[in-house]
Amino acid sequence: MQEALRLIFSDTRARPSADVEVPGFEADWSAATPSRGLPLTLRNLRKSFGDNSVLRGIDLHIPAGQFVTIVGRSGCGKSTLLRLIAGLDQPTAGNIGFGDDRLPGDVRVMFQEPRLLPWARVLANVEVGLGADRGSPDAKARAEEVLLEVGLTDKRDQWPAVLSGGQKQRVALARALVSRPRVLAFDEPLGALDALTRIAMQQLLERVWRDQGFTAILVTHDVAEAVALADRVLVIEDGRITNDVLIDLPRPRRRGSADLAALEGEILKQLLEGSEDSSEL
């Protein structure tokens, strides 16, 4: 039980598909919530596993409330970087700073696997995200509020086993959101979903980020997803940030637009060229 809870606490305009009917998908973007996220600064961050150097001196500043996506080929260090930011691993060298007012529970992670407790109903799974506040008088109300935000109020008493993949991920998102984190890190949370459910979940992630004002950091293999969601896209190659692309386009963004396609093409070209260079070594 304790190990299961430890893993969980490591946990941030097409119409949705039938599997993910998200309320408020047509939200008014002119009324975005002011940022309540934390800034993030990395200085000369390095991580090695034995003789294998995975991160080779990362310097980065993310302003409070920004949505940053990280892309790169498998093995480039994306997920390692995210784990360091989340405090799941310790750097070999360098440091990570979140400003002066970080509190316990301010940073949460959402993984590709929902990691729901099979013996607990949906509402109880969400309450787990409250940590020490699980026993507070308002715990249930807080969990119900966040279930409403992700469109799963009608599933509050269901067992995880009867939920679809998209619904399980929404429960995992609700669990991460219930403590109102100021930094939410996503490690390929949508990678196992079908295409339509994935698009709807992208819209949901963008909406809750807009509504809650946290700092978002998303690791993904999907360049189109990265460009559609981010304020900035970071490209990592061989343990280093090799490109930092500003996505200066208004929201909500129209998938398939020429502007998004051009940015996606620029990033894909760099990744493909890097792959060809590696294959020649």
UniProtKB/Swiss-Prot annotation:
It is a peripheral membrane protein. SMART domains: AAA. Residues 40-263 form the ABC transporter domain. It comes from the Bacteria. The complex is composed of two ATP-binding proteins (SsuB), two transmembrane proteins (SsuC) and a solute-binding protein (SsuA). The keyword Cytoplasm does not apply. Keywords: ATP-binding, Cell inner membrane, Cell membrane, Membrane, Nucleotide-binding, Translocase, Transport. It is found in: Cell inner membrane. Part of the ABC transporter complex SsuABC involved in aliphatic sulfonates import. Responsible for energy coupling to the transport system. GO terms for molecular function: ATP binding; ATP hydrolysis activity. It is an enzyme of class 7 (translocase). Belongs to the ABC transporter superfamily. Aliphatic sulfonates importer (TC 3.A.1.17.2) family. GO terms for cellular component: plasma membrane. It catalyses: ATP + H2O + aliphatic sulfonate-[sulfonate-binding protein]Side 1 = ADP + phosphate + aliphatic sulfonateSide 2 + [sulfonate-binding protein]Side 1. InterPro entries: AAA+_ATPase (IPR003593), ABC_transporter-like_ATP-bd (IPR003439), ABC_transporter-like_CS (IPR017871), ABC_transporter_ATP-bind (IPR050166), P-loop_NTPase (IPR027417). This is Aliphatic sulfonates import ATP-binding protein SsuB. Its EC number is 7.6.2.14. Pfam families: ABC_tran. Coiled coil: none annotated. The keyword Iron does not apply. ATP binds at residues 72-79.
